[in-house]
Design a protein with these regions (language model features):
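Conserved class I S-adenosyl-L-methionine
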Residues: 236-243
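Glycine-centered loop/turn positions within well-structured domains
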Residues: 155, 225, 237
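Conserved hydrophobic/aromatic pocket- or pore-lining residues that grip, position, or stack substrates
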Residues: 133, 157, 219, 227, ...
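Active-site-adjacent "gating/activation" loops or surface patches in catalytic cores
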Residues: 202, 217, 235
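Class I Rossmann-like S-adenosyl-L-methionine
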Residues: 1-208
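Glycine-rich helix-loop-beta junction characteristic of Rossmann-like nucleotide cofactor-binding loops
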Residues: 209-210, 229-235
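Class I SAM-dependent methyltransferase Rossmann-like catalytic core
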Residues: 211-217
Length: 245
């Protein structure tokens, strides 16, 4: 919510909003691993850096490692320009650290996933969480769980059944919505066994989309859709939602 507020106030277009959103969430998600890579090349450890320097280095490193669409020189130059506005004296330091990361990226990214500590660093989890998972599931399965959790989730839309016109089938309504989305250049696909679900790629801002604003679709994971189908609630059913957002 806070991020959306700032993005809307900044007046950015959808492409820039997407860039900022990935950067913010990516840094939060990968913070420990980013700090690990920065510490490999920096004489000053991350925990001893000024807040502005630490943040800009995380931003630059994330772009170098995780954003293939951003050229290395662009990530470095923009990071240097940003730190000049915040702390001009640190510009040469930020430049040197990011260039060292760029030059030796493969070596800097490498980490052997053979210990709890290294799993915690690479997947950016607190050590106690990884220890608990290993105790419960074993080392190999824990790595598989952490790897799965690190994947970017797909976006699924649930079509609202209450929008059906008299005599209209759900298949027809979903099909029309899919055609509408494809006409806007979005990649969409239906989901076998869940007729109200649509997988969509390239959707930047759902909250402003007419289909969302008019109540035809909402964003929902497949697991949540399956729960509702298994429950099969009736018109007079009383349902207690314990996981409401």
């Amino acid at each position: 919510m806070a991020l959306n507020k700032y993005l809307n106030e900044a007046g950015l277009d959808d492409q820039d909003k997407g860039f900022v959103t990935e950067l913010v969430y990516g840094i939060i998600e990968k913070k420990r691993y980013l700090d690990y890579m920065i510490n490999k090349v920096s004489k000053i450890k991350v925990r001893k850096m000024q807040h502005s320097v630490r943040l800009v280095l995380r931003m630059g490193t994330y772009q170098l490692v995780h954003m293939d669409g951003v050229a290395d020189y662009a990530a470095i130059n923009e990071s240097v320009n940003l730190i000049k506005k915040l702390d001009k004296r640190s510009a040469s330091f930020v430049n040197a650290v990011l260039r060292n990361i760029s030059r030796s990226l493969d070596d800097i990214k490498s980490i052997r996933l053979n210990t709890v500590d290294n799993l915690a660093i690479y997947y950016s989890y607190e050590k106690w969480i990884v220890e608990g998972l290993v105790k419960e599931y074993g080392f190999e399965r824990t790595e598989a769980i952490l790897s799965a959790l690190s994947q970017k989730p797909s976006i699924y839309l649930r079509v609202n059944r209450t929008k059906l016109r008299p005599g209209q089938s759900m298949d027809d309504l979903v099909g029309k919505i899919v055609e509408d989305l494809r006409g806007q250049g979005l990649e969409t696909s239906r989901i076998d066994g869940i007729e109200e679900a649509i997988k969509v790629k390239g959707l930047k801002s759902i909250d402003k989309h007419p289909l969302f604003r008019e109540g035809y679709v909402s964003v929902q994971d497949l697991s949540s859709m399956l729960v509702a189908r298994i429950m099969d609630p009736k018109r007079e059913s009383r349902v207690l939602d314990l996981c409401a957002a």
